[in-house]
């Protein structure tokens, strides 16, 4: 009977398994997370010499404190999930990886992954994927992480306005600045680390120019010629005087909705028109939702009258935003990278890297819709 009661206590508690040492916790407070991380790693530290042990303990303390600081900021309501054995094992793997490397980048990436890990449901594919990412990240050099980020960026589609797209491209500055250090060995190693699969002789991705011309068919165009622009503005009772644009008041009151849709265009002082949206699908979807399908031919005429960029002009568009794009585009157009397809763990690690470095959330789910 006594044995059954003891078993009952264990079943109702948290079991920590660390190198054969079993510990039971019947409750968890937020400050206990540091002690949990230390405990699940403790038995592994025995392999270090006295001098190395001191450094290992310092790194473990730093990692634990930094983890709790970020947890408190981002997911303070989920701290008690550290009572779950699977999450403790993930924390153990992440902490040990940093103890071994002591690399600042490793710590940032691993803590970011643990924050994601705390937020997902157990026994899901996403949970398994994050656990795998925690094991894979310590194997990757900073150059490999940057390469994954670049490949993910190439595969993303941005929908919005011209200025926001420029801002989005510019936010890659820190990554493309380091692009020259990425080597063929980094590309090959991603296959060994199960982040990508390479199929030599088969192109899995379009070249940079072709992809952007196809995906963003409005941004990469020259302005609409003056005569076509003038006819368009005349139809919508617009006039331009010394760089100032005005609408006929009566026309505005009668056709307010169509006037609002003109925000998809940029009207220049020289009398030409450019497109303010990234692509024609977004433009036409907006017209349809506003009940303005009758005006679609007018916008189609603008598009047909404007000349598409050539490949050199597409490249120059990026380089004018940041000169480091020159090397990054050359890198991504290598045959060895065009034959690469991201595996889920590589896609996920690259997505988290982009989210962290760009300062905006890049949803992983968009790749699997």
Predicted regions and their residues:
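Long, low-complexity intrinsically disordered regions enriched in small/polar
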Residues: 1-50
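Long, low-complexity, charged/polar intrinsically disordered regions in eukaryotic proteins
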Residues: 83-138
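Short acidic alpha-helical/loop segments enriched in Asp/Glu that coordinate divalent cations
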Residues: 160-169, 199-208
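Short helix-coil junctions and helix-kink-helix linkers
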Residues: 165-181
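A short, conserved structural fragment
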Residues: 184-203
């Amino acid at each position: 009977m006594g044995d059954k009661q003891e078993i009952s206590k264990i079943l109702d508690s948290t079991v920590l398994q660390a190198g054969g040492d079993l510990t039971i916790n019947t409750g968890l407070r937020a400050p206990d997370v540091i002690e949990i991380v230390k405990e699940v790693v403790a038995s592994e530290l025995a392999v270090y010499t006295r001098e190395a042990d001191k450094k290992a303990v310092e790194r473990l303390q730093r990692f634990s404190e930094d983890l709790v600081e970020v947890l408190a900021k981002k997911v303070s309501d989920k701290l008690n999930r550290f009572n779950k054995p699977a999450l403790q094992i993930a924390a153990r793997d992440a902490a040990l990886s940093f103890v071994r490397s002591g690399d600042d980048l490793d710590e940032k990436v691993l803590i970011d992954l643990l924050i994601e890990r705390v937020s997902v449901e157990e026994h899901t594919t996403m949970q398994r994927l994050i656990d795998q990412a925690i094991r894979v990240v310590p194997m990757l050099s900073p150059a490999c992480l940057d390469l994954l980020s670049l490949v993910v960026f190439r595969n993303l589609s941005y929908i919005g306005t011209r200025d926001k797209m420029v801002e989005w491209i510019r936010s890659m500055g820190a990554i493309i600045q380091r692009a020259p250090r990425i080597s063929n060995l980094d590309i090959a190693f991603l296959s060994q680390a199960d982040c990508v699969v390479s199929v030599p002789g088969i192109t899995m991705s379009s070249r940079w120019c072709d992809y952007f011309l196809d995906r963003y068919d409005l941004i990469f165009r020259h302005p609409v010629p003056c005569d076509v622009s003038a006819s368009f503005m005349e139809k919508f009772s617009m006039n331009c005087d010394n760089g100032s644009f005005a609408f006929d008041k009566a026309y505005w009151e009668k056709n307010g909705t169509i006037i609002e849709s003109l925000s998809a265009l940029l009207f220049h002082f020289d009398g030409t028109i450019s497109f303010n949206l990234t692509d024609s699908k977004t433009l036409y979807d907006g017209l349809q939702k506003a009940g303005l399908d009758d005006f679609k031919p007018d916008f189609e005429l603008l598009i047909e009258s404007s000349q598409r960029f050539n490949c050199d002009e597409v490249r120059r568009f990026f380089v004018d935003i940041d000169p480091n794009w020159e090397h990054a585009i050359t890198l991504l157009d290598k045959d060895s990278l065009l034959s690469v397809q991201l595996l889920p763990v590589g896609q996920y690690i690259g997505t988290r890297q982009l989210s962290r470095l760009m300062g905006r959330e890049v949803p992983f789910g968009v790749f699997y819709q």
